[in-house]
Amino acid sequence: MYEYANRFAALGHQVTVLHSLRRPFKKMRSPLWWKRLIFVIRGAARPAWFSLDSRVTSKIVDEFSDSFVPDGDILFSTWWQTAYALAKLSPRKGVPVNLVQDYETWTGQEDLVKSSYRLPLQHAAISNWLRVLVEKESGRSVQLLPNAIDTSRFTQTVEPALRDNFSVLALYSEESRKGTRYIISALEPLRAQYPGLHFSFFGVYPRPASLPEWVQYYQKPTNLAALYNQHAIFLSASLGEGWALPPAEAMACGCAVVCTDIGGHADYTKANETALLIPTENTTAIITALTTLFDNKAL
């Protein structure tokens, strides 16, 4: 959403990003005054990890209500809980648009998530599989607003033919739905078959103890495009995604891609043409797909 905010600001629109301390259906574990204080101390109103345009107003509010939301033309919600808050706002706040970025059921409350699609809002989805899902639940047409990548940043700088054919990169995550455990299970069998295997992970976490010593790990890499360009293959074993950015970024940087056959990869992958697609939760399939690429450099 910060990228959207920057792009809108560049077009001359007045943009405000609101971060709410309270959310519908989420119980607060600490007093409101304490949360306010912590957010101020952390400087959380503006992201430290993203270069937000100085023309964008970004602030912390107690809640998404008429008292805290400024009048405007269009208002976006980016999480199912905040969609409920949008539905209660005055028309003066703008046309409410619920931007669905994933099937957000990993914290439970699936019935409430589905019900959010039936709220009297304009609904938009970032991928075709989400568009179909929301249309089915809402009974209304849903606007497709697909994700995109910055091809001025993510571009091929090293010819694939010059890369190590046995170099593989993957995202490390401790979220079970990302499927990292299936990748880790494939590492030693692959290395036994290909002693020259060079496997790398990147992620936000400190290096996990579960990784073999021979595996390279990059924590919060500052130049992700360069990292993609250092590898011949990108691997994603996600069980579910809204519209996954890393495989698309890797493609733009010239990597061959192996990824799971899920909706979040479907908008930019075509089996055996733009990617090798594998079933979820399947270590054997990971090994087979990588073996195919290792043994067929032309692919």
Segments from the language model and where they lie:
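Short glycine/serine-rich donor-binding loops of glycosyltransferases
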Residues: A244-P247, H265
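Aromatic "clamp/platform" in nucleotide-sugar-dependent glycosyltransferases that forms part
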Residues: L239
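Conserved acidic donor-binding segment of nucleotide-sugar-dependent glycosyltransferases
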Residues: A271-N272, L276-T283, T291-K297
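Short hydrophobic beta-strand element within catalytic cores of glycosyltransferases
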Residues: A256-C259
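Nucleotide-activated donor-binding/catalytic signature segment of Leloir-type glycosyltransferases, i.e.
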Residues: G203-A225, I233
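Conserved donor-binding/catalytic core segment of Leloir-type glycosyltransferases
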Residues: A124, P160-K178, I184-R191
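Acidic anion/phosphate-binding donor-loop and adjacent secondary structure
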Residues: T105-D111, Q143-D164, A226
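Membrane-proximal helix-turn-helix segments that form the acceptor-binding/catalytic region
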Residues: D62-G72, Y103-E137
